[in-house]
Each structure stands twice: as C-alpha cells, then as structure tokens.
A protein has these predicted regions:
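C-terminal extracellular loops and terminal segments
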Residues: 145-149, 719-726, 767-789, 836-848, ...
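Glycine-rich, aromatic-lined ligand/substrate-binding cores of catalytic
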Residues: 840-872
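Conserved small-residue
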Residues: 242-244, 248-290, 720, 739-840
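Extracellular/periplasmic, surface-exposed regions of secreted and cell-surface proteins
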Residues: 136, 181, 275, 303-306, ...
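Extracytoplasmic gating/loop element in the C-terminal half of outer-membrane beta-barrel translocons
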Residues: 284, 467, 539, 578, ...
C-alpha cells in the first residue's frame, strides 16, 4: 500500500495556522483579575507579590495595594509579603478580589536558643545574633566555623587553612592574655568538640550569646561568649528523604614569587662579595643555571573535596525523628595532606504520655588526618639549584659548602617518606525527660555524655638526607581519651497574670564531671623499616602519660518578666563550684540583669509603615572563666628527676618542686555593660540592630611576683589573679528586603568596632612572648592592646659612608644597610630603642551579602573583611633577609646595589653584620583586607519537571569560596592567626564547587 505524503508547502501552512490560532485559544481561556491587598487593619500593602500558582506569571501591588493580572479563570493566586502569612486564593472566574494578609507570628517572634530554654526574639533583652542553615548551606567548606565567618557581628573567626583543623573564634575581642575561646553548647550539652567535627548539613541554627545578660546563665564558662548550636529535628508529616552531593576543586592563592636558580646564584655571589667571602666559582655565569626547581610548585597541588549527606526525617503528632549520615573526603592543596570524616546524627522525640516526653540527640564523627612532614618554610627557603631527585632516584639535597649550597633539607621527600596520622572519634549524646505538670509548669532532666578519642601515630624512617641524615628510624604514638558526664535538672515556669503580666522562670542545678587519660611513647632504631610495630623498635626513647579529672557543680536561675509586651526584664544568677580551686575559693557567683522597652507597643507610638517595631535594651552582668586554669593549679606541683647523691655518688630519684601552691587562685571575671536597640522599618523590609558594650576583665591570671629567696624565679609558671583587660566597641547589623516578587533582592550588612587594652599585669616589666630566631616579637604591657609587636623602627637605608658616620652608633652598619631610629637620642642603637611597632588586633570587622532571586535562579555575593590591624610577616625574615643560603622572594631583585638604588630593600650580605633581619617594622605590614568571600549561583528546578520522578525538590549550585582579595599584604593571605604572626602557615585555598540537592 502506497503511503500518502503531505506536500511540504501544505505542512508549512498548517504549522503557521496552528501557531496563529494557539495564542488566540490561550487568550480566550484567560481573564483579567483585578484586586487590592490589605492587612488586618485595613491598610493597603504596597509591593506584595501576586503570582499565579504553578507558573511564573505574576505582578506586584502598586502604591494603593492594587494589582491586575491576566490568568486562568480556574487558577489560584498566591499572595505574599514580608512579615505576613502567604495567602492562596482560588479565583473561580472572579474578576474582582480583595485579599487580606495576616501577620506572620513566627516571623515576628523568631525563637532563639539562650541556654536552658528558648525565648522569642521580641522578648530578648540581651545581645544575641543568629544564623540559620539557609545562611550556610551553599558554603563549599568542610568546617562550620569557616561557613559562619563574617556573618555575625562581634565575632572574629580565623581559618586555620589545613583540612580538619579548627578555626579560631573570638567574641568581642580578646578578653584575656590567656585562653579566651567561647563556650560551645551543642543541643544543650557544653562541649569542647571542635566545629570541624560537625556536618553543616545537620545544623539547623546557630545562636551566639554575646553580652553578660545572656551568658551569665553559664557562669564560670560564659566570660568569652557562648556559641549555641542546634541540630535538625524531624517535623510532623510523611518521611522526607534528602540527598546532597558536593564536589570541589581547591588551589592556593597569591603564592609568593621566588627566585629561580640563575637569580639565586647571582644573589649568592653578591652576599659573598659584600661579606668579604669568596663566591662560588661554579656560578661565575649565573645564567647558565637556568630556572631550576620551583619548590613551592612542587609542594602545592590542586586539592579535591567531596562531601555527601543523606538524611531522613518525619513524624506524627506524638513523635518526630531525624537521622543522617555524611561523608567528606578532602585532599589538601599541600602534597600528602588528606582529611576524611564520617558523621552520623540521630535526633528524636516522643510524647509517650500526656505528661511525659522523651527526646534524645546523638552526634557521632570519626575522622582521619594524614600528612607527611611537610614544611612551608623549607619549601620557601630551599635552593632552586637542586632537582627534586637525583639521577639515581634518590632525594637531592645540599652537599658542600653551606655558605654556597645551603643547609635546607629537600622539602618534598619527607612528605612522601614520613608518615603522620591522627584518628579522632567523637560521641556526643543526651537524653532528656520532660514532665508537664500544668500548662505553665514543666520539669526537665537531661543526661549528657561526651566522649572523645584521639590517636596520633608518627613514623620517621632513617634516610641519608643531605646535609643532615636521619640516622635512626623512630615511631611515636599517643592515646588521649576524654569522658564528660553531665546531668541537668531544672523547672520551667511560664504564666500570664491578669492578661498583662507574663512571668517566666527557670531554676535548677547542673553537675558535670570530666576524666582524661593520656599515654604516649616513642621507640627508635627499627630493625625493619617496613615493619612499623612498636615491638620492632629496639630503643625506648620516651614514655609518659597522666590521668586527670575535674568537676563542676552549679545552681542557676533565670526570671523573665513582661508587662503588656512593652516593658521587659531578665535577671539571672548562677553559682558554680569547681574542683580546680582551693576550698576557700571554690565557689563563685555570677549575676546579671537586663531590661528592654518596646516603644512601638506604646499606645502613643505612631502606627505607620515607617517604624513597625522599636526596642531599646540595656544590661549588666558578671561572668567567669576557668579555661586558663589547670585542674590542680591551686596545689604545689612536683616533678621527678635523677640526681647524684650519697657516698657512692650514684644517681638517686628525687622529687623537684615545680610550682608553688596558690590556694587563693580563682576565676577570671568579666563585668560587661551593654546597651542597644532593634528597629524594624517599612513593613519589616528594613531591620537594624545596634549594640555598644564595655567589657572589663578583672582577676585575670598573670605571673605571680615571687621573692627570689623562695627558690623560685619570677618567670616560673606560678600564677595569681591580678590582671585587667578592657574591650569596648559597637556592633551593627542591617537586613533589607530591597525587592519582592518575581525578582527578589535582599541585603545583609554587619560592622563591628572593638578597642582592646591591657589595664594591669601585676608587673611594671612587660611580658615578651612569641620568639622567632631567638628574638621576641610580641609584648604584653599595660595601656597597650594584647599581643602588640615590639621592635626597632626603620628609617630608610644608608646610601653612603657619610650617612653611617653621622648617624647614631649602629654596630656593623655599612652603606646599603637599614638605618634604625635612635628613639631615646642617646647616640647608640640598642635594645632601649625598641618600641611598639604594630597592633595585630583589627579595629573593624565588616561584611555584606546580597542575595537575588529570579524564576528559580538565586545569586548570592558575599563580601567580608577586617581593617586596622597589622601582620608580622615572619616568613620574610628568611625570604628577604639575604643573609644566609636561603632562597628569596623576587622582591629582593630591587635590593640596594649602590647609592640611590633603593631606600627600602637593603644590600645582600652573608651573616647580616648590621642585623637587618632583627625584629623591626620592616616586617610589619598592613593586615586590612576586603575579600570577595563567596559567590554562589543556584537553580531550583520547577516542580512540574520533577513530579514524574517523584522528586519534591531539586537544586543545582555553582559556588566559589575566597574568590578574590584586595589587600596590601605581600604574603600568601592576610588571614593569619589571632596573634598576627605569619610564619609557615598552611595556605588558605580558593574553592570551586558544584553541588546537587534532592528532596524526596
């Protein structure tokens, strides 16, 4: 049978006809719906989003709250606006509609976690900042601390860089010269579990308690702030399966440019000639050496990170559950550095009886950190004249005159031969029973358990390294076990009297006990290097260990009072007893009080769209810190030692006094005053918070002044409570909703200013700390900030001998050397001319995040930075010193080589007779920076695309972390440690990431 074929011309005509008729048919099926959107008071709502459900068809209301939209007569309108509940209205052919939006109480009364309870944000009288999972979900990092960096005012976070290492967190400045880390509380259990052990996908929210009115409930551990972490829980409804996968690439940023082999040989010749030594005759023509080896390029690599999480949650009216498992695998940007982590989270609650509810949380993680013996400093200093390996396959290294060929060991070989592994296992759990006596009275009892295990295993084989061989194989192992038990019992009372007076009360007790067991050993001389068992070691090099314990017993109470939601009062008190102190100073009391006035609730307050809510706050409280106190600091301590004693002059074991007893040692205390206000403007489109604080640490632990006749020196480890530190500053946060509707745009801004000063050290003599090349870099002294840099002030370079002769006596100085200022005008450059040369503490922390959304697309751009701080670039001591056989950065190509050639980079001279590399402002650099911290572009697929696959939600994201940095700092990255010293730090990485999220 012959098939009929339609002529092409007729086919084209039919297609055109259908194309013309189809829009007409669609238009015939649509109607124009007009209407107005109002709130419950009858006021029109301007800028509300009006969308046809299931489509991208929509508009926004005008200045009179009116709208007009062409849509299906049987469609559904979805009307939404910030601060109001979203309304769905079925059109049913109607052409005129009036939509009334009701206030969203959940949005207006966000609940924050404050310790032993929760509180509506509108009822807060203290300084609390919060972020949710939505604020961190797109950060392509392995550490929760990295994800929250810059997003909370008053909180400084410094990334360690190395995979698996914890960030450093400081809240409202450095409150002590000792440990000033905040207390971390996970699901109600205080813990020293690092944030790197948590899976970010399991975190529901994070609340930071900053002022004493909210931290005093934790008494002797609240002085440095409290970080409250709440993990996810199930909600009522059918089970939900969530799957997320993230794949990332990482590389180092701003790697210093180093000299090649030819450039180094030329520099070496200059160093030799200028110091009166003979240059290497083999380098008479440096250009013949070519480029040589770039050791930093050999050490660094492109890192890869994979992060996967699967969770399942759900529940009914009587029980809820959430369970998840996570796996992270990260190869660092430094060769041989690897990190792997498994996590498990299980949260559940059950209303077993009308008056009895049980809930539990389990957080488990197992991680492994591996690395060889990498050394960033050696890679910067190693000479480019050597290959990575010799022709026979052995590792190369310096061989010969060390003044020419150097003494820095091959920096790549140890990363492959030496082995270092740390295994950690963390188990944090709690079980809570909640008894409800009446609607207004409850009792909670929580048992918490926190177990941590760390196992370190280092193996170093013998090898004929040049210039110094490793002659003995060694293996070091250590086991560290920590167990903490917690039992909290407290009553919760919440009742409103006469419809105006609301009273909340929490009162109870807490008991905590910790034990720690540590053991380590090292054996040398292994018969077989490939058999690493300790039994294979022939020589016991060292063995040691200890067991310690501490306990804390506490009684605490908090009362909240509210009169008509206008006048608010919060008062807390906690009494702690710690085993770490002597009997007469074992107990401490920590009170606080704060008040707030919600002016916007007053009858006379204008009811308009400009100011929706205004609350003024003030508070004062005293908190404590025992973080810097050892478990037995109040007791005298002794060490065992061996001394020749007796007629036979044989060695006898004896006890040697190490520290004096101090039964009067007690807590460091922090008294803090806080005032602030919160404002909501323009129908909650603008929300602004401001806080000003004065934070004074007293009874800070400092070295005790002890008469030398006691047999102890003033520099021993005996401490007393006599120091004082002051921090004062302001915090601001601003959230704006700039656009709503089809195109959405929100902005978050934070800014923090802090000024730090030591008020008393119990000594007129400064403390000098942080020694580099046998010289102290950092000073602690009265009336200066903590950790200021202390050294000489430079004044250019001597251009000729006449300038040397007319300057103050400066031993070793010649033309081309650095000129140092004679600050005391005594005609001699010596230690008396040292002064404060820099402050590592930033004055300002700031950030800005912009989020835009359009038809399923979301774009987030996050900026973060600090200002007002200095960095001591200790790497440049060796890498621009031009005083030894180390490689240098290309900055030295602009060195002084004759009168007028440079006034900043000195001459190259071996041995450094003028001490050009002494601690001075030559190595102090501006640490301020503005970083494009994160850019994320994501797309949420339309639901109609996913229905057939039974996928509820699917999201694709592309992200880049640490995109670009504007800074004047010359090192790898301006984000160095809290002390501001940059020396051999693991580089901060730039991360490119692809993420997929599915919900079923």
């Amino acid at each position: 049978m012959q098939k009929y074929k339609m002529p092409i011309s007729r086919l084209r005509m039919m297609v055109c006809l259908i194309g013309m008729l189809l829009p007409m048919c669609m238009f015939a099926q649509q109607i124009t719906v007009q209407g107005v959107v109002k709130d419950q008071t009858g006021e029109t709502v301007i800028g509300a989003s009006v969308m046809e459900k299931g489509t991208t068809n929509g508009t926004i209301t005008g200045i009179d709250g009116d709208f007009s939209l062409n849509m299906s007569p049987n469609g559904t309108l979805v009307v939404s606006f910030v601060g109001y509940k979203t309304q769905e209205v079925q059109v049913k052919g109607q052409k005129q509609l009036q939509v009334v939006l009701s206030e969203d109480a959940e949005m207006l009364d966000e609940v924050v976690v404050i310790g032993y309870g929760t509180m509506k944000k509108s009822d807060l009288t203290g300084a609390v900042s919060s972020i949710g999972n939505k604020d961190i979900k797109d950060s392509p990092v392995s550490n929760l601390g990295q994800a929250i960096q810059g997003k909370i005012s008053g909180v400084q976070i410094v990334d360690a860089g190395k995979p698996g290492d914890n960030v450093s967190i400081k809240i409202r400045g450095l409150g002590s010269i000792n440990n000033c880390d905040p207390l971390v509380v996970i699901d109600g259990v205080p813990t020293d579990l690092g944030l790197s052990s948590l899976n970010m996908a399991d975190v529901e929210r994070l609340d930071v308690l900053k002022d004493a009115s909210v931290t005093a409930i934790y008494g002797s551990r609240g002085a440095n702030g409290v970080v409250m972490i709440t993990t996810k829980r199930g909600t009522e409804g059918k089970g939900k399966l969530a799957v997320s996968a993230n794949y990332s690439f990482q590389n180092a940023t701003n790697v210093p440019s180093l000299l090649n082999a030819a450039q180094y040989a030329e520099l070496s010749n200059d160093m030799m000639v200028n110091s009166g030594r003979n240059p290497n005759p083999e380098w008479a023509n440096p250009s013949e050496l070519g480029a040589g080896t770039d050791w930093m390029d050999e050490l660094l690599r492109t890192g890869v990170m994979q992060n996967y999480t699967v969770s399942y949650s759900g529940g009914n009216e009587k029980s809820h559950y959430y369970v998840s498992g996570g796996f992270l695998d990260q190869s660092g940007i430094v060769k041989s550095v690897n990190y792997r982590r498994f996590t498990f989270q299980s949260n559940s609650d059950a209303q077993v009886l009308k008056w009895l509810k049980f809930s539990n949380n389990i957080t488990f993680s197992a991680d492994t950190k591996k690395s060889g013996s990498y050394n960033i400093g050696d890679a910067l200093k190693a000479l480019p004249i050597y290959p990575v390996k010799n022709e026979d396959g052995s590792w190369s290294g310096p061989d010969g005159n060390s003044e020419w060929y150097g003494s820095t060991r091959n920096p790549i070989g140890p990363t492959e031969l030496n082995k270092s592994q740390t295994d950690g296992y963390n188990f944090l759990a709690n079980l809570t029973a909640e008894l409800t006596f009446t609607k207004w009275l409850k009792f909670k009892s929580t048992f918490g358990y926190d177990a941590k295990f760390w196992f370190i295993d280092n193996f170093t084989p013998k090898y004929n390294w040049k210039p110094t061989p490793t002659e003995e194989t060694s293996r070091y192992k250590s086991d560290n076990k920590s167990f903490t038990y917690l039992w909290d019992n407290y009553f919760l009372f919440d009742h409103t009297f006469a419809e105006k007076h609301r009273v909340g009360l929490m009162a109870g007790m807490s008991a905590q006990w910790n034990t720690n067991d540590y053991l380590n050993a090292q054996k040398n001389v292994f018969m077989f290097d490939n058999v690493h068992e300790m039994d294979n070691g022939e020589e016991m090099y060292a063995i040691g260990g200890n067991e310690t314990e501490w306990a804390l017993l506490s009684y605490m109470a908090r009362v909240n009072y509210s009169y008509e939601d206008r006048y608010l009062l919060t008062a807390t008190i906690r009494r702690d007893g710690s085993s770490r102190f002597g009997k007469k100073h074992r107990w401490g009391t920590f009170p606080s009080v704060s008040v707030a006035w919600r002016a916007s609730q007053e009858k006379w307050f204008p009811k308009n769209d400009y100011i929706n809510d205004l609350k003024v706050r003030a508070g004062y409280g005293v908190t404590g810190s025992q973080a810097s106190v050892g478990n037995y600091s109040y007791l005298a301590s002794y060490n065992t030692s061996v001394y020749p004693f007796g007629i036979s002059s044989g060695n006898q074991t004896a006890l040697v006094s190490s520290t004096l007893a101090n039964p009067y040692i007690h807590w460091e205390e922090v008294a803090q005053t806080n005032i602030g206000f919160d404002a909501s403007l323009f129908n909650s489109r603008v929300m602004f918070s401001f806080d000003a604080y004065l934070k004074e640490t007293r009874d800070m632990l400092v070295k005790a002044s002890i008469p030398i006749t006691s047999g102890f020196e003033d520099t021993t480890t005996t401490y007393t409570n006599a120091g004082k530190v002051r921090n004062q500053g302001i915090e601001m946060s601003l959230h704006t909703i700039n656009l709503t509707g089809e195109l959405g745009w929100e902005t978050n801004l934070t800014a923090t200013y802090n000024k730090n000063k030591i008020k008393d050290l119990n000594s007129d003599v400064p403390y000098y700390i942080n020694q580099i090349n046998n010289s102290y870099v950092t000073m602690l002294t009265k009336d200066y900030p903590i950790n200021v840099f202390y050294g000489y002030v430079t004044d250019g370079i001597f251009q000729n001998q006449s300038e040397v002769n007319t300057h103050a006596v400066q031993p070793g100085a010649e033309p081309g050397d650095i000129r140092f200022r004679d600050l005391n005008n005594d005609g001699v450059i010596n230690d008396s001319d040292r002064t404060v040369i820099g402050n590592p503490n930033p004055s300002w922390l700031f950030s800005m995040n912009n989020s835009l959304s359009y038809k399923g697309f979301e774009l987030s751009v996050f900026l973060q930075g600090i200002a007002g701080n200095k960095i001591y670039n200790a790497n440049n001591i060796d890498n621009t010193g031009m005083a030894a056989a180390y490689n240098q950065t290309t900055d030295v190509l602009k060195r002084w080589q004759g009168e007028g050639t440079s006034n900043s980079m000195p001459r190259a001279v071996f041995g450094d007779p003028n001490q050009n590399t002494r601690v001075s402002d030559r190595f102090v650099e501006n640490g301020s920076y503005l970083r494009l911290k994160n850019i994320t572009l994501s797309y949420t697929f339309p639901k109609q695309w996913l229905q057939k696959a039974q996928i509820e939600n699917a999201r694709l994201s592309l992200s880049c972390e640490n995109v670009a940095t504007i800074t004047g700092y010359s090192g790898f990255d301006p984000e160095v440690g809290i002390n501001g010293i940059d020396q051999n730090r693991y580089p901060i990485s730039r991360t490119f990431s692809l993420g997929l999220n599915f919900n079923f």
